[in-house]
C-alpha cells in the first residue's frame, strides 16, 4: 500500500482526473504519482524533477511497485511529450516559478484536459497567467495542513466566460463563491497581519508614510471581503 498522503497532497490527488494518465512536475520523491498509481486512481504516471538527488530517491521508491510510474529528469515540462498524459500537477513551489514553467511549456499543454496547481504563494500571478494562457478554473479548495493553509486549483482548457475581478484574482473566484470557514479564518489572519504592520508604523510615528496608506487600503479590502461573506 502506498504511503499515506499529507492533507495538502491529498487535496491535490482529489482533483486529478481519475482513470487518466498524469504527470507530476517537481515530483521530489514521487509520493503523489506513486499514491495515485498504487491506489489505481490513474493507470500510469510520470514523475518529473530537475534535481538528481530527489530523482534517485524517487526511482528507488517506485522500483518496488512493478511499473506504472516513470521517473524522468526534466526542467519543468521540457521532457514531457505532448499528448502522453491528460493531467498535470504542479505542487509545492512558488507561484512565480510555476508561471515560468507554464509559460515556457505552453506547447506541451496542448491536449491536456486538466492542470492542477498548488502554489506556495504568488497565487494571484498564477491565476492571472492561467487566464492569459486561455484556461479557466473548474475546481478550487482551501486546505489546512499542520499550521499552514494552501490553495489547490484545477484548470481546464478554454477561456473564462466571465472576467475576473481584482478580488477573484487575489483570493480565487471559486474560493470566494462558497461559504468556507477556513476562508474566513484566512481573511481574519491576513487582516491581523496587516493591522500589525500598520500599528508598527504608527508606533514609529509614520502614519503619513505611503506604506501606511497602502496598509490601510489593504485592511479596507479585506474587511469588505469579510463583510461580503457574513
What are these regions (language model features)?
Residues 1-20, 34, 56-83:
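S-adenosyl-L-methionine
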Residues 84-92:
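Short SAM/SAH-binding signature in class I
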Amino acid at each position: 500500500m502506498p504511503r499515506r498522503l499529507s492533507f495538502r497532497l491529498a487535496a491535490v490527488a482529489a482533483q486529478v482526473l481519475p482513470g487518466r494518465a498524469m504527470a507530476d512536475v517537481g515530483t521530489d520523491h514521487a509520493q503523489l504519482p506513486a499514491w495515485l498509481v498504487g491506489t489505481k486512481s490513474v493507470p500510469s504516471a510520470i514523475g518529473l524533477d530537475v534535481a538528481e538527488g530527489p530523482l534517485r530517491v524517487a526511482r528507488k521508491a517506485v522500483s518496488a511497485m512493478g511499473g506504472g510510474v516513470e521517473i524522468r529528469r526534466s526542467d519543468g515540462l521540457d521532457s514531457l511529450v505532448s499528448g502522453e498524459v491528460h493531467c498535470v500537477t504542479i505542487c509545492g513551489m512558488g507561484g512565480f516559478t510555476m508561471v515560468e514553467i507554464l509559460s515556457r511549456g505552453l506547447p506541451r499543454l496542448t491536449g491536456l484536459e486538466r492542470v492542477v496547481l498548488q502554489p506556495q504563494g504568488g497565487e494571484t500571478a498564477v491565476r492571472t497567467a492561467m487566464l492569459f494562457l486561455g484556461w479557466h478554473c473548474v475546481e478550487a479548495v482551501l486546505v489546512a495542513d499542520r499550521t499552514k493553509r494552501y490553495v489547490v486549483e484545477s484548470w481546464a482548457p478554454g477561456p473564462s466566460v466571465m472576467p475576473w475581478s481584482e478580488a477573484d484574482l487575489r483570493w480565487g473566484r471559486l474560493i470566494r463563491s462558497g461559504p468556507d470557514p477556513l476562508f474566513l479564518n484566512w481573511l481574519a489572519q491576513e487582516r491581523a497581519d496587516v493591522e500589525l504592520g500598520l500599528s508598527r508604523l504608527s508606533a514609529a510615528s509614520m502614519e503619513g508614510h505611503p506604506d501606511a496608506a497602502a496598509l490601510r487600503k489593504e485592511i479596507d479590502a479585506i474587511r469588505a471581503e469579510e463583510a461580503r461573506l457574513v
